[in-house]
Amino acid sequence: MVKSYTRYEPTEFFGVIASSGCNILGQPSSSAKSVGRAIVGGLESVLEWDLKTGQLLSKWKDSDCSAKVTCIANFDEMYAVGYADGSIRLWKDGELLITLNGHKSAVTTMDFDKMGTRLASGSMDTDIIVWDIVAETGLFRLRGHKDQITKLLFITPPSKNTAEETVVDTDIDSGDMDVDSKSSDSFLLSVGKDSFMKLWDLSIQHCVETHVDHQGEIWAMCVSPDAKRCLTAGTGSDVKVWEISFPDDNNFTPTTKAFQQLGTFTRQSRDRPITLAYDVSNRYVVFQAHDRLLEVFRLRSSAELEKILNRRRRRKKSEDVSITLKDEYEPFALIRTTARASSVAWIPGNRTPTLVTSLQNNSIEVYALDVKSEGSAAPLTERASRISAIEIPGHRADVRTLALSANHDVILSGANGSLKLWNKKTTSCIRTIECGYVLAASFINNDKCIVSAYKSGELEVYDIASSSLIERIQAHDGAIWDLAVGHDGTYFATASADHTVKLWSLKSSFDFVPGTTRKVTTLKLEQTRQIDFTDDVLAVKISPDGRFVAASLLDNTVKVYYLDSLKFFLNLYGHKLPVLSMDISYDSKLLVTCSADKNVKIWGLDFGDCHKSIFAHQDSIMEVTFQPDTYNFFTCSKDREVRYWDGKSFDLILKLRGHHSEVWALAVGPTFVVSGSHDHSIRLWEQGDDLVFLEEERERELEEQYESTLVSSYENAEADGEVKDGDVAAVTKQTIESLKDGEKILEAITIGIEDLDQEIQYRLDLLKSPGKARGPRNPILAHLGVSAEEYVLNTFKKIRSSHLDDALLVLPFEHVLSLFRFIDIWASRKWSIPLVSRIIFFLLRTYHRQLTTTVKMRPLLNNIRSSLRGSLQEERSLIGYNAAGLSYLRHEWELTHNTSLEDIDSTSLEVDGKKRAFSNIV
């Protein structure tokens, strides 16, 4: 009989407040009492935090994506999220709208245009892609940078800021419609690590300006809200200031530049910048570098600059004076965060300018500027104050140890600086204890206390109910690497770098309350015995039956002793590097060890024989733990995986993937597994309803490997066939979803062509022999009761718009020719003209040379052209009619709702003695 296992599935991860590799967004809150909201990346999820209460409002995660979030941009409440695999997902109200694939590596920067209909994205693959959000497809790919894109922004010429957003001239009778494309963001500004600053004209899809004024990488850029100034910062402390001045069409010459460098001013920090950002009022600009310093500059008003100019004229008694950039940008505040900053953003909507910053130690801080200190002599470091922070829901450092309570409802985690207790059901932090560098911790005394071991050699015992320290002792002269609790929870063993294993027990004692005669019961740690070794002890374990104690040494061996007499029993050797962790089975018959040599060895405790040696991981194995009451065990490694093994057959059952960094710790319950990682996350894996069969699991892994190889082969083939010359290219990227969609189209065309040919042959046979019955149709078409052309069109309609172009690239050319037969039918019957037009235009662009040399396609293409021209004219007329109607409704609404200030009659105010009320003032 084939043995089956229960599948472990990822259910939740917690402990992450903000990932260091993603920017942060500040958003206003609906509550007047709240400071605002923060939108940050949390590994593969997007987290929304309330900055006042520290509550996690929502978590957005696509179950099909395991890549890390690298970039976030927003248009109002619609968020574009870029991932490390190059994909982009659009979210609104916590729901996934669309997925866009085009980049071949991590997305580094994104920006929406002012209408929110286009999105520009830059990546580590040096490409810029402009996306059409409405059509859910990529418009074009811009090439020109030679290294990673660090920042890009849509630019609207300042002269057009006050113009109407959209100008529509409509001729209802003819259906002509002209939309002024220049009214929208028609320029794109980009900077990269190649030291280039490029200005792209999106109307012609070409780079019109390139500036190479920086000596090295350009790490940050921002544009003022009025689009008149641009700031760029590179590797040094200098900030370059650019004036944005787009020439009119009449004054345009080939040598005219829209960006003119005005000069530089200096930041205080010497580290490379990460973020530059203007606030919405255009009064302040913040500079964030790769350190703990945030610098805020204030932009002086024209009146202040005029005072400075007059003062200089009086001092020099000359008119030959001018304003410098140092005069315009005044250092206003210096903010020193508690750790290195990852990103910073302004929070709009607050009365005082407020900054939110994510830190590299997995926390978020909020600072408010003291605007009353403008013009005062207050120190720069005292002009901003921290008003809130989010620190409790996560550790400041990587998770080094995990433990479970006896009832498996509470999870204990330890890191450098803190111990935390988590509710397993709600994944909320219920206790936080400040401490030192924790290397091991566990529950003792019937889950009433916690014992923790530190790198300094200290042992501490805490009372859980009060979170108070009961006792602290210097237990060892070196770091305590491991801690093992006995079967009844009243004693434990510690393994240290001072070459000893010490056994400890909890003793109750009575102490007098100072100043009184009352006695209180306290717990004390008492060392009972000690085992001396010649090398550092890295791990220790006590058998469940209380008979043995095992210790792993730096000399790659494991020594087993009788616990009662501490007499030597077994010496286990075979590992090539030190054993980092070990565990003993529930019946005390098996010992499993894991080592830095990437191997797991299973030993018998009867005679000390090695049952099996398994090459288990691709990197050092950090911990191994048996599943309760079974011989199955789990391992975790620096290769970011948790693996599930059968200790009897020595087979690999499951690979649990999800962590983005080294996995340091494991805790195994009866039906779940908890893992802690260097990425600050604690992940929970629980048993599901699915069963795992080893053969099926291996086949599934091989299929995943084949699919990934297939996708990479398509990408390599496309890369070999791409023309690298030129600034513009098509937006294509094959994914496994697009390949599957292409196979669906291929299958539908094959079935449809057979049915069409059968129909033609049947009509020819009717001419020869009237009354002849038609042969059986394809079972799929017969079951659905549709014609071949309807079936193929329905297949296209089911494909995502973002996958359509990539799916069409999968088709062989002979199937493309067959597809044109269906396009001819669809165009003549006026079915789904927008979809049909998109398909035919893409095929004509892709296979233009082949189609023009195929003689038999000429009549078919002529038929399609004549049919499609009339249909497109009707669609154009319909759009023009609707646009005219919307323009009329907008005009009527403005007449009834908008009132200008010139309508106010001052004489009527004097007579009536009261102000006139207005519904809205624009």
Swiss-Prot record:
The keyword Nucleotide-binding does not apply. CDD domains: WD40. InterPro entries: G-protein_beta_WD-40_rep, SSU_processome_Utp12, TBC1_cilium_biogenesis, WD40/YVTN_repeat-like_dom_sf, WD40_repeat_CS, WD40_repeat_dom_sf, WD40_rpt. SUPFAM superfamilies: WD40 repeat-like (SSF50978). WD repeats lie at residues 63-101, 102-141, 169-210, 213-252, 268-307, 336-377, 394-432, 434-472, 475-514, 532-571, 574-615, 616-655, 658-695. Transmembrane segments: none annotated. One of its GO terms (cellular component) is cytosol. It comes from the Eukaryota. Signal peptide: none annotated. The keyword Coiled coil does not apply. One of its GO terms (molecular function) is snoRNA binding. The modification Phosphoserine is found at S769. PANTHER family: WD REPEAT CONTAINING PROTEIN 3 WDR3 (PTHR19853), WD REPEAT-CONTAINING PROTEIN 3 (PTHR19853:SF0). Belongs to the WD repeat WDR3/UTP12 family. This is Uncharacterized WD repeat-containing protein C3D6.12. It comes from Schizosaccharomyces pombe (strain 972 / ATCC 24843) (Fission yeast).
